[in-house]
Protein backbone atom coordinates (compact mmCIF):
# COMPACT_ATOMS: atom_id res chain seq x y z
CA UNK A 1 0.00 0.00 0.00
CA UNK A 2 1.44 3.37 -1.00
CA UNK A 3 -0.64 5.68 1.30
CA UNK A 4 1.93 8.34 2.07
CA UNK A 5 0.59 10.35 4.98
CA UNK A 6 1.26 14.04 4.55
CA UNK A 7 1.93 16.98 6.85
CA UNK A 8 -0.09 20.16 6.41
CA UNK A 9 1.74 23.13 4.89
CA UNK A 10 2.59 24.66 8.30
CA UNK A 11 4.22 21.51 9.64
CA UNK A 12 6.00 20.96 6.32
CA UNK A 13 7.52 24.46 6.66
CA UNK A 14 9.37 23.35 9.81
CA UNK A 15 11.69 21.25 7.60
CA UNK A 16 12.98 24.45 5.91
CA UNK A 17 12.74 27.16 8.61
CA UNK A 18 15.14 29.57 6.84
CA UNK A 19 13.29 29.54 3.51
CA UNK A 20 11.13 32.49 2.43
CA UNK A 21 7.40 31.83 2.69
CA UNK A 22 7.18 31.51 -1.09
CA UNK A 23 9.90 28.85 -1.10
CA UNK A 24 8.28 27.09 1.88
CA UNK A 25 5.06 26.88 -0.14
CA UNK A 26 6.89 25.55 -3.22
CA UNK A 27 8.70 23.02 -1.04
CA UNK A 28 5.29 21.85 0.20
CA UNK A 29 4.02 21.76 -3.38
CA UNK A 30 6.75 19.53 -4.78
CA UNK A 31 6.80 17.11 -1.83
CA UNK A 32 3.08 17.10 -1.04
CA UNK A 33 4.11 17.45 2.61
CA UNK A 34 5.21 13.78 2.71
CA UNK A 35 7.82 13.37 5.46
CA UNK A 36 9.94 10.99 3.39
CA UNK A 37 10.25 13.56 0.59
CA UNK A 38 10.63 16.56 2.90
CA UNK A 39 13.57 14.81 4.57
CA UNK A 40 15.34 14.75 1.18
CA UNK A 41 15.30 18.56 0.96
CA UNK A 42 18.63 20.09 1.95
CA UNK A 43 17.66 23.33 3.76
CA UNK A 44 21.15 24.77 3.09
CA UNK A 45 20.51 24.64 -0.64
CA UNK A 46 18.03 26.85 -2.53
CA UNK A 47 14.64 25.48 -3.54
CA UNK A 48 15.79 25.47 -7.20
CA UNK A 49 18.92 23.47 -6.38
CA UNK A 50 16.84 20.96 -4.43
CA UNK A 51 14.31 20.50 -7.23
CA UNK A 52 17.08 19.97 -9.80
CA UNK A 53 18.97 17.57 -7.52
CA UNK A 54 15.90 15.44 -6.71
CA UNK A 55 13.92 15.45 -9.98
CA UNK A 56 16.07 16.57 -12.90
CA UNK A 57 19.08 14.26 -12.57
CA UNK A 58 19.14 10.56 -13.39
CA UNK A 59 20.48 9.84 -9.89
CA UNK A 60 17.86 12.12 -8.28
CA UNK A 61 15.83 10.25 -5.67
CA UNK A 62 12.49 11.46 -7.03
CA UNK A 63 13.40 11.00 -10.70
CA UNK A 64 12.32 7.33 -10.60
CA UNK A 65 10.19 7.33 -7.46
CA UNK A 66 6.77 7.50 -9.15
CA UNK A 67 7.61 4.75 -11.63
CA UNK A 68 8.90 2.54 -8.82
CA UNK A 69 5.84 3.10 -6.61
CA UNK A 70 3.37 2.41 -9.41
CA UNK A 71 5.24 -0.68 -10.62
CA UNK A 72 5.17 -2.15 -7.11
CA UNK A 73 1.45 -1.51 -6.77
CA UNK A 74 -0.14 -2.14 -10.17
CA UNK A 75 0.01 -4.90 -12.76
CA UNK A 76 -1.83 -2.85 -15.43
CA UNK A 77 0.90 -0.22 -15.28
CA UNK A 78 0.35 1.16 -18.82
CA UNK A 79 -3.34 1.95 -18.20
CA UNK A 80 -2.63 3.39 -14.74
CA UNK A 81 0.19 5.53 -16.10
CA UNK A 82 -2.08 6.90 -18.85
CA UNK A 83 -4.83 7.69 -16.34
CA UNK A 84 -2.50 9.55 -13.96
CA UNK A 85 -1.01 11.45 -16.91
CA UNK A 86 -4.49 12.59 -18.00
CA UNK A 87 -5.47 13.70 -14.48
CA UNK A 88 -2.17 15.59 -14.11
CA UNK A 89 -2.89 17.42 -17.37
CA UNK A 90 -6.33 18.53 -16.12
CA UNK A 91 -8.75 15.86 -17.37
CA UNK A 92 -10.91 15.06 -14.36
CA UNK A 93 -14.07 13.16 -15.30
CA UNK A 94 -14.44 9.45 -15.96
CA UNK A 95 -15.72 9.81 -19.52
CA UNK A 96 -13.08 12.34 -20.63
CA UNK A 97 -10.24 10.25 -19.17
CA UNK A 98 -11.60 7.07 -20.81
CA UNK A 99 -12.03 8.89 -24.12
CA UNK A 100 -8.52 10.35 -24.08
CA UNK A 101 -6.77 7.04 -23.39
CA UNK A 102 -9.08 4.90 -25.54
CA UNK A 103 -10.23 2.55 -22.77
CA UNK A 104 -13.73 1.52 -21.69
CA UNK A 105 -15.15 3.36 -18.67
CA UNK A 106 -15.40 0.25 -16.41
CA UNK A 107 -11.67 -0.46 -17.02
CA UNK A 108 -10.76 3.12 -16.14
CA UNK A 109 -13.06 3.14 -13.11
CA UNK A 110 -11.44 -0.05 -11.78
CA UNK A 111 -7.98 1.54 -11.97
CA UNK A 112 -9.23 4.85 -10.56
CA UNK A 113 -10.66 3.08 -7.52
CA UNK A 114 -7.33 1.34 -6.94
CA UNK A 115 -5.53 4.70 -7.25
CA UNK A 116 -7.95 6.15 -4.68
CA UNK A 117 -7.37 3.19 -2.33
CA UNK A 118 -3.61 3.73 -2.34
CA UNK A 119 -4.01 7.47 -1.72
CA UNK A 120 -2.75 8.85 -5.04
CA UNK A 121 -6.07 10.09 -6.43
CA UNK A 122 -9.11 11.53 -4.69
CA UNK A 123 -12.69 12.17 -5.71
CA UNK A 124 -13.50 15.84 -5.45
CA UNK A 125 -17.14 16.79 -4.98
CA UNK A 126 -18.80 20.18 -5.41
CA UNK A 127 -19.22 21.22 -1.76
CA UNK A 128 -22.83 22.39 -2.02
CA UNK A 129 -23.91 19.27 -3.94
CA UNK A 130 -22.03 16.39 -2.35
CA UNK A 131 -24.75 13.86 -3.22
CA UNK A 132 -24.74 14.78 -6.92
CA UNK A 133 -22.73 11.96 -8.56
CA UNK A 134 -22.46 13.92 -11.81
CA UNK A 135 -20.52 16.61 -9.97
CA UNK A 136 -17.48 14.46 -9.22
CA UNK A 137 -13.94 15.18 -10.37
CA UNK A 138 -10.84 13.03 -10.03
CA UNK A 139 -7.72 14.90 -8.92
CA UNK A 140 -4.22 13.88 -7.89
CA UNK A 141 -4.03 13.86 -4.11
CA UNK A 142 -0.25 13.52 -4.07
CA UNK A 143 1.43 16.76 -5.23
CA UNK A 144 4.80 15.11 -5.78
CA UNK A 145 3.10 12.86 -8.35
CA UNK A 146 1.39 15.89 -9.88
CA UNK A 147 4.72 17.70 -10.21
CA UNK A 148 6.43 14.62 -11.64
CA UNK A 149 3.76 13.93 -14.25
CA UNK A 150 3.52 17.55 -15.25
CA UNK A 151 7.22 17.99 -15.96
CA UNK A 152 9.35 14.83 -15.98
CA UNK A 153 7.93 12.68 -18.85
CA UNK A 154 8.49 15.54 -21.34
CA UNK A 155 12.02 16.06 -20.03
CA UNK A 156 13.26 12.47 -19.82
CA UNK A 157 15.53 12.52 -22.88
CA UNK A 158 17.07 15.86 -21.85
CA UNK A 159 17.62 14.63 -18.27
CA UNK A 160 19.25 11.43 -19.57
CA UNK A 161 21.68 13.63 -21.54
CA UNK A 162 22.64 15.31 -18.27
CA UNK A 163 20.94 18.60 -19.19
CA UNK A 164 18.15 18.53 -16.60
CA UNK A 165 19.29 21.77 -14.98
CA UNK A 166 18.90 23.73 -18.23
CA UNK A 167 15.48 22.15 -18.77
CA UNK A 168 14.38 23.17 -15.29
CA UNK A 169 15.55 26.78 -15.73
CA UNK A 170 13.96 27.17 -19.19
CA UNK A 171 10.81 25.04 -19.07
CA UNK A 172 9.83 24.50 -15.43
CA UNK A 173 10.85 27.48 -13.31
CA UNK A 174 8.91 30.00 -15.48
CA UNK A 175 5.66 28.03 -14.95
CA UNK A 176 6.21 26.97 -11.33
CA UNK A 177 3.65 29.55 -10.14
CA UNK A 178 1.07 28.03 -12.46
CA UNK A 179 1.77 24.54 -11.05
CA UNK A 180 1.43 25.99 -7.54
CA UNK A 181 -2.08 27.34 -8.25
CA UNK A 182 -3.96 24.26 -7.04
CA UNK A 183 -1.48 23.70 -4.18
CA UNK A 184 -2.04 27.28 -2.97
CA UNK A 185 -5.81 26.79 -3.13
CA UNK A 186 -5.51 23.73 -0.90
CA UNK A 187 -3.31 25.68 1.54
CA UNK A 188 -5.92 28.46 1.65
CA UNK A 189 -8.73 25.96 2.28
CA UNK A 190 -6.78 24.48 5.19
CA UNK A 191 -6.12 27.99 6.57
CA UNK A 192 -9.81 28.98 6.40
CA UNK A 193 -10.92 25.76 8.09
CA UNK A 194 -8.30 26.21 10.82
CA UNK A 195 -9.47 29.78 11.50
CA UNK A 196 -13.15 29.11 10.84
CA UNK A 197 -13.43 26.33 13.43
CA UNK A 198 -12.72 29.00 16.06
CA UNK A 199 -15.56 31.19 14.75
CA UNK A 200 -13.20 33.83 13.40
CA UNK A 201 -15.41 34.67 10.40
CA UNK A 202 -18.62 35.26 12.32
CA UNK A 203 -19.82 31.68 11.96
CA UNK A 204 -18.71 28.16 12.93
CA UNK A 205 -17.09 26.63 9.82
CA UNK A 206 -17.45 22.85 9.68
CA UNK A 207 -16.45 21.97 6.11
CA UNK A 208 -14.37 23.43 3.32
CA UNK A 209 -14.07 22.61 -0.34
CA UNK A 210 -14.60 24.03 -3.76
CA UNK A 211 -17.60 24.86 -5.95
CA UNK A 212 -18.13 24.64 -9.67
CA UNK A 213 -21.09 25.03 -11.96
CA UNK A 214 -22.49 27.32 -14.64
CA UNK A 215 -23.18 31.05 -14.61
CA UNK A 216 -25.00 33.30 -17.08
CA UNK A 217 -23.05 36.39 -18.09
CA UNK A 218 -23.53 39.09 -20.70
CA UNK A 219 -20.98 39.19 -23.53
CA UNK A 220 -19.73 42.36 -25.28
CA UNK A 221 -22.95 42.61 -27.31
CA UNK A 222 -25.12 42.30 -24.22
CA UNK A 223 -26.22 38.76 -25.12
CA UNK A 224 -26.53 36.42 -22.14
CA UNK A 225 -24.54 33.22 -22.45
CA UNK A 226 -23.75 30.36 -20.09
CA UNK A 227 -20.16 29.70 -19.08
CA UNK A 228 -18.49 27.38 -16.60
CA UNK A 229 -17.63 28.96 -13.26
CA UNK A 230 -15.80 27.94 -10.12
CA UNK A 231 -15.00 29.26 -6.64
CA UNK A 232 -11.58 28.21 -5.26
CA UNK A 233 -12.55 28.19 -1.59
CA UNK A 234 -16.01 27.59 -0.17
CA UNK A 235 -16.24 27.08 3.60
CA UNK A 236 -19.63 26.24 5.04
CA UNK A 237 -21.29 26.55 8.40
CA UNK A 238 -24.26 24.20 8.24
CA UNK A 239 -25.15 25.22 11.79
CA UNK A 240 -25.45 28.93 10.94
CA UNK A 241 -26.32 28.41 7.24
CA UNK A 242 -23.47 30.78 6.38
CA UNK A 243 -20.53 30.57 3.99
CA UNK A 244 -17.08 32.06 3.54
CA UNK A 245 -15.85 32.15 -0.05
CA UNK A 246 -12.42 32.94 -1.42
CA UNK A 247 -10.27 33.39 -4.50
CA UNK A 248 -6.56 32.44 -4.56
CA UNK A 249 -3.85 33.71 -6.92
CA UNK A 250 -0.27 32.43 -6.74
CA UNK A 251 1.00 34.83 -9.40
CA UNK A 252 3.53 37.61 -9.91
CA UNK A 253 0.72 40.07 -10.54
CA UNK A 254 -1.57 41.88 -8.15
CA UNK A 255 -5.21 40.95 -7.71
CA UNK A 256 -7.36 43.59 -9.42
CA UNK A 257 -10.98 44.78 -9.42
CA UNK A 258 -11.95 42.23 -12.10
CA UNK A 259 -11.13 39.30 -9.80
CA UNK A 260 -13.07 40.97 -6.98
CA UNK A 261 -16.12 41.50 -9.21
CA UNK A 262 -16.04 37.88 -10.39
CA UNK A 263 -16.02 36.47 -6.86
CA UNK A 264 -18.85 38.76 -5.71
CA UNK A 265 -20.89 37.75 -8.78
CA UNK A 266 -20.23 34.02 -8.35
CA UNK A 267 -21.06 34.22 -4.66
CA UNK A 268 -24.66 34.89 -5.69
CA UNK A 269 -24.76 31.39 -7.21
CA UNK A 270 -24.65 29.79 -3.76
CA UNK A 271 -26.63 32.33 -1.72
CA UNK A 272 -29.91 30.43 -2.15
CA UNK A 273 -28.68 28.06 0.57
CA UNK A 274 -26.09 30.10 2.48
CA UNK A 275 -25.59 33.72 3.54
CA UNK A 276 -22.03 34.82 2.78
CA UNK A 277 -20.31 36.21 5.87
CA UNK A 278 -16.88 36.89 4.32
CA UNK A 279 -15.23 37.25 0.93
CA UNK A 280 -11.55 36.38 1.32
CA UNK A 281 -8.82 37.00 -1.24
CA UNK A 282 -5.41 35.33 -1.08
CA UNK A 283 -2.65 36.86 -3.20
CA UNK A 284 1.04 36.08 -3.58
CA UNK A 285 1.75 39.56 -4.95
CA UNK A 286 -0.72 41.83 -3.17
CA UNK A 287 -3.49 44.04 -4.53
CA UNK A 288 -3.96 47.00 -6.86
CA UNK A 289 -4.69 50.46 -5.44
CA UNK A 290 -8.38 50.06 -6.31
CA UNK A 291 -8.84 47.95 -3.17
CA UNK A 292 -8.07 51.00 -1.00
CA UNK A 293 -11.47 52.38 -2.03
CA UNK A 294 -13.25 49.36 -0.50
CA UNK A 295 -14.91 49.72 2.84
CA UNK A 296 -16.88 47.23 4.87
CA UNK A 297 -16.27 44.30 7.14
CA UNK A 298 -17.10 41.50 4.75
CA UNK A 299 -13.94 41.55 2.55
CA UNK A 300 -10.57 40.26 3.78
CA UNK A 301 -7.36 40.77 1.79
CA UNK A 302 -4.68 38.23 2.70
CA UNK A 303 -1.24 37.43 1.34
CA UNK A 304 0.91 34.30 1.37
CA UNK A 305 2.60 35.69 4.50
CA UNK A 306 -0.80 35.74 6.26
CA UNK A 307 -0.92 31.95 5.93
CA UNK A 308 2.34 31.58 7.85
CA UNK A 309 1.63 34.08 10.64
Protein language model regions, located:
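Alpha-helical sensor/transducer elements of the RecA-like P-loop NTPase core
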Residues: 1-19
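The alpha-helix within a helix-turn-helix
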Residues: 13, 28, 98-99
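Amphipathic alpha-helical "lid/sensor" segments that cap RecA-like P-loop NTPase cores
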Residues: 16-69
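Winged-helix-like regulatory helical subdomains adjacent to P-loop NTPase cores
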Residues: 47-99
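Short amphipathic alpha-helical interaction segments
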Residues: 101-118
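A short, conserved structural fragment
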Residues: 116-127
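Short, Lys/Arg-rich nucleic-acid/phosphate-binding segment
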Residues: 125-137
Amino acid sequence: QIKLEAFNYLDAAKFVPEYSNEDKAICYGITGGVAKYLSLIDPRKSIDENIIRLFFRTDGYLYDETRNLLTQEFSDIAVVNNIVEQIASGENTLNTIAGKIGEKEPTVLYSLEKLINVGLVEKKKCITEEKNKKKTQYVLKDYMFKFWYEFIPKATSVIEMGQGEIYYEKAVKPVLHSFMGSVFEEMCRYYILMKGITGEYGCFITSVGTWWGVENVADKNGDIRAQSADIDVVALSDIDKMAVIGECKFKNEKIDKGIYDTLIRRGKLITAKYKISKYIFFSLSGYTDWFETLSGEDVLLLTLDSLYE
